């Protein structure tokens, strides 16, 4: 982002100025319309809940003890869709480790994209959950990784093609990370990420 020539201060100021011109009711109405455009595409019903009057933590406890609660499974499915709708939009960055809910100045794992499973898991349901266009931030990142990863592959392995190691970030870094050699030097993130291109 700091290499693309945009003035982030001006962009943020323009967004804030535009938002301040709207009243709360208009902002809420726009938000609901925008959100429902994605959310209302899917309705999943497995069974009526017999536990809907029980607090969620108790339902989860009962579920882990073997109680059947298909409505809880539906709730989790829709919660996963909510998270992706809220954190991955065309033209933006992909959903990352902490997402938009991070409250740290320096978040755990830098809120990066861990390519040995975490980044992929965020998007496992995107196509089957009828949210295909929310896949595009990850697909755009993969295209950028193919460019930076080509240089990494040449520099580290003297080989053709491209790679991304265990972690990447909004700058599409692909080189090995510091940390335990058991994961820091893992060069197969690109291969795994390419499954998302195929699914899309």
Stretches with model-predicted labels:
Residues 1-113, 131-136, 142-152:
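Acidic/polar, glycine-enriched structural segments that form the non-catalytic walls/loops
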Residues 88-117, 124-195, 199:
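Helix-terminus loop motifs that line ligand-binding clefts
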């Amino acid at each position: 982002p700091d290499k693309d020539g945009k003035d982030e201060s001006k962009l943020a100021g323009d967004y804030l100025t535009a938002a301040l011109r709207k009243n709360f009711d208009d902002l809420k109405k726009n938000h609901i319309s925008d959100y429902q455009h994605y959310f209302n595409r899917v309705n999943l019903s497995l069974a009526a809940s017999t536990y809907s009057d029980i607090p969620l933590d108790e339902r989860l406890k009962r579920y882990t003890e073997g109680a059947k609660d298909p409505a809880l499974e539906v709730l989790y499915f829709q919660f996963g869709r909510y998270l992706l709708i809220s954190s991955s939009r065309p033209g933006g960055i992909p959903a990352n480790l902490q997402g938009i809910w991070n409250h740290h100045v320096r978040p755990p794992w830098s809120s990066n994209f861990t390519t040995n499973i975490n980044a992929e898991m965020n998007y496992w349901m995107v196509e089957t959950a009828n949210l295909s266009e929310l896949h595009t931030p990850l697909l755009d990142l993969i295209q950028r990784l193919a460019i930076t990863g080509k240089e990494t592959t040449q520099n580290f392995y003297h080989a053709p093609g491209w790679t991304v190691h265990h972690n990447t970030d909004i700058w599409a870094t692909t080189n090995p990370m510091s940390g335990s050699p058991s994961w820091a030097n893992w060069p197969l993130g690109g291969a795994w990420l390419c499954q998302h291109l195929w699914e899309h």
